[in-house]
Amino acid sequence: MQNYLIYFATLILGVAIFYVFNALGSQTVMLKVSSNTAELIGLMNEAMSVVSVFVSIVLGFLVVYASTFLMKRRKKEFGIYLTLGMGKTQVAKILVIETLLIGVISLVIGLLLGIGISQGMSVVTANLFEADMTNFRFMVSTSAIIKTIIYFAIMYVIVMALDVIIVSRAKLINLLYAGAKAQKNHAKNPVVCVLVFIIAAILLGTAYYKVTAGVRTISDFQGLGIQIAKGIIGTFLVFWSVSGMLLAIVKRCRRFYYKGINSFSVKELGSRINTTVFSGGIICLLLFFTICILSSAMAIRNSMNHVLETCTPVDVQFSKLYSYDAAEDYDMTGHNVEENLKACDIDTSKLTDVTEMILYAPEDINIGDFFGKAFAESGSEDYFKEASMETMHIGEYNAFVSSFGGTTIDLAEDEYVILCNYGEMEPRYNAGLAEGQTVTIKGKTYHPKYSTCVDGIVHISNSESNAGVLLVPDSVDMSDCDFWYDIYSANYNTTDQTEVDALNEYYSDANFYKLQEAKTEAVLGEDGSYYSMNCETSKRLRDNSVGLTAMIVFIGIYLGVVFLISGAAILSLKELSEAADSKEKYRILRRIGVDEKKIRHSLLAQSGVFFAMPLLLAIVHSVFGMQTAMFILTAFGRGGLLGSILLAAAVILVIYGIYFMITYICSRKIISE
């Protein structure tokens, strides 16, 4: 019965989670969102459907594993049924009825729990998509219920079939004496265990180094795959070696080893670890994936919020990118962005706080000129030594930031500033700025105003992607420099949400390019090759960002929780199995006078270490894995990782802790029988 409690609880949680994430599609229908957001929600729902197939496979393996595991524990019971005259067909019928009852009850309870949780998920979804919930009501997704029933019904049918096969093929003698066949536990040579542990440490250590300090040396997926393989092999070797090392090390601590029943506890723990090398490694990896997936998903959400606040400060921005031909010979007179917009009959009467910035591409100022000596001498910066540095006048930048209340910059006549928020480029610039790197423009030398980059933008964006802009005094003559960008920024002159929505729709991609098509020559020049125009709104950038963020967050939570439940359930079943196998040992302890308090303390210590081992190794993996995740997440912004890790840790400790407590209580009952 104790074994089935874990099995039953896992089924209920599996059903609830499966329903919750498959009900998102029905819940988002009620949210009042823009057309662009609606498309992103549709894409998210399609992604969730694909992920649900993978989740169903994971849960299917878990259910089949748990059922097969429990069947092995009941072989003696079935042997007794056969001895009393029941046929294998009758025993098979009992199993089918049991599975049906467990399946129906777990489905009903799981769906009720899932429906309740999904109402809270609706609020989370609305918050992620910044949606209007005025039309929200209590929602039950019929499609999600049907999908959940179908998927889990398939799992239960497979379980029934396997149970019947096991009973029908088993011999009576094997069933009756199944309980007497203890799992063989061969003693391991401590010296071999130490050598294997050293090999595991080398594999893990080199993998940790490669994915952190040496991450830039990994150039392809094959290189990354090698490090992942080393981590997986090292994990299994740690579990194989620890069981033999544990007993050898503790035996040397004689005062501890011979105190109370510590010798019994240590041997029992070593036996458990020794028989769970494979499952312990799998559980550790599942917990590692859980920690990284949950932390990364939540970190992306926090980072995106920060990025959207700082990188979309104006409502709309028109950008004109010049071709190389235009940069050399195009006459800007009368052809700035505002003139182009008028020529295309694009209405700008609703715009205010208008600013216009020109970005130049001087031939004699290159990006690599601003890197420090360490970067410049590394030989890996050749591309940047030839790439032109985008340059603009400080006055135009100050006018732009003043339009949304940003911080302006004062430059002396011999100073410059580098504007950058892209994580990959900042260290390069900062190295040069810290060294006081100078730049010469038309014979005059300019010094850096600050020893680090200024965090700022000129293009609105949904990521920190400004790879560097050189800000120079207005007195610098750029008339003979190549044009690169002409950027026209503005806010809407209304705060009425209906009017704002209409303006966002008017300046959307489809409408903007449709208006341009009617005036192609006026926009692109006589030969159509001088430049291209682009329009971007903060609303569209936020929608795209929020849609991607929501998809990552939901998929991350979905997979993370499923992996966590799977790992905890497997560990719990193994622990209960070990407790059942050790009942006679605890009975002997009672007979020789060991009090119940010491027995319970021994069981608690064994269970605690048994649960803690895969979690602790998973945490060590995650310390290095999350550093790699931080490197990858620079594309989504920075910040919020600590809070995300703490939140993920809380979720893991709650679910993992619940499984641990249930397992300990059930194990205590088993050894007391």
Where are these regions (language model features)?
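Short cytosolic juxtamembrane segments of multi-pass membrane proteins
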Residues: 1, 170-185, 580-581, 669-673
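N-terminal Sec/SRP start-transfer signal
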Residues: 1-15, 184-193, 197-198, 240-287
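Peri-transmembrane interface segments
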Residues: 2-9, 20-54, 69-72, 214-233, ...
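Selective transmembrane-helix segments that form parts of the transport pathway or gating/packing helices
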Residues: 4-11, 95-113, 149, 153, ...
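Small-residue-rich transmembrane alpha-helices
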Residues: 16-30, 65-69, 102-131, 144-169, ...
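Juxtamembrane interface at the cytosolic side of transmembrane helices
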Residues: 63-76, 166, 246-258, 565-592, ...
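Nucleotide-cofactor and metal-assisted catalytic machinery
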Residues: 308-550
